[in-house]
């Protein structure tokens, strides 16, 4: 009974948090709406780095981000796809998003195969003024639709804060703080994740990055990963990307490589 009550409290807390994001957005959006992303802006995605963009998609735009990865966790070889995230700008500086279930196929080794959870969320871009530290707040939940052996039991709420700081016209520093809650897991109830990215803009269409990711489970050893990659915009609404990474300790995958393609439809409403 205590586990169910705790699970219900966390789910309700994330639900209330998502509602608060919407209410706060409605309160402050008239003052900052002019600085929010517009359909004339170039596409910005939450990939290929783990760190998500601090900017939302423009109001009335629908963006799909997709990719495939090859990783080597637990002395296994695993291929996963399509890592699809759908993002819809429902108001100025406000979007709803959903992570579509991704399939992990174990090619060799003891790693588990299966689908991940479907995970809806709300994202509010708090500080959209260029030249400052941009910050967004995200509240979401992984619904128990995937393979329990792969992702764990029960609903899995999370809160997240992506941020970015433009140092110069070419250099920027980005990061993200995330708290994942696993109320139905009998061992590890929370996982905290921190990321830090150094990004270099090569041109109006291309950029490269290097990233550190740290995962800190409440009842397990931390995992550290070094990730790097590049993006190239085929147009204002299309992007291809590439990333390659390596684990910094034994708990992280020893190797990861991936490719992605993203596109955006504008002025849908």
Q: How does the language model describe each region?
A:
Residues 1-41, 268-269:
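Cleavable N-terminal export/targeting peptides
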Residues 32-269:
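Transmembrane beta-barrel domains of Gram-negative outer membranes and organellar outer membranes
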């Amino acid at each position: 009974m205590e586990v169910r009550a705790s699970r219900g409290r966390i789910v309700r807390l994330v639900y209330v948090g998502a509602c608060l994001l919407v209410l706060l957005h409605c309160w402050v959006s008239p003052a900052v709406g002019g600085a929010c992303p517009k359909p004339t802006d170039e596409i910005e995605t939450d990939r290929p780095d783990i760190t998500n963009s601090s900017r939302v998609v423009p109001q009335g735009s629908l963006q799909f981000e997709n990719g495939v990865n090859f990783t080597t966790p637990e002395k296994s070889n695993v291929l996963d796809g399509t890592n699809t995230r759908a993002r819809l700008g429902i108001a100025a500086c406000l979007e709803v998003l959903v992570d579509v279930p991704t399939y992990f196929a174990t090619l060799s080794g003891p790693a588990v195969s299966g689908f991940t959870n479907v995970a809806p969320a709300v994202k509010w871009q708090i500080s959209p003024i260029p030249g400052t530290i941009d910050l967004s707040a995200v509240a979401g939940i992984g619904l128990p639709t995937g393979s329990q052996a792969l992702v764990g039991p029960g609903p899995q709420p999370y809160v997240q804060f992506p941020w970015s700081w433009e140092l110069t016209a070419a250099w920027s520093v980005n990061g993200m703080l995330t708290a994942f809650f696993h109320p139905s897991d009998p061992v590890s109830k929370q996982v905290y994740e921190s990321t830090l990215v150094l990004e270099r803009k090569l041109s109006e269409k291309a950029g490269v990055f290097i990233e550190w990711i740290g995962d800190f489970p409440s009842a397990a050893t931390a995992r550290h990963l070094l990730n790097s990659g590049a993006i190239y915009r085929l147009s204002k609404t299309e992007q291809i990307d590439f990333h390659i990474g390596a684990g910094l300790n034994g708990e992280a995958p020893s190797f990861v490589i991936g490719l992605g393609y993203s596109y955006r439809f504008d002025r849908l409403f």
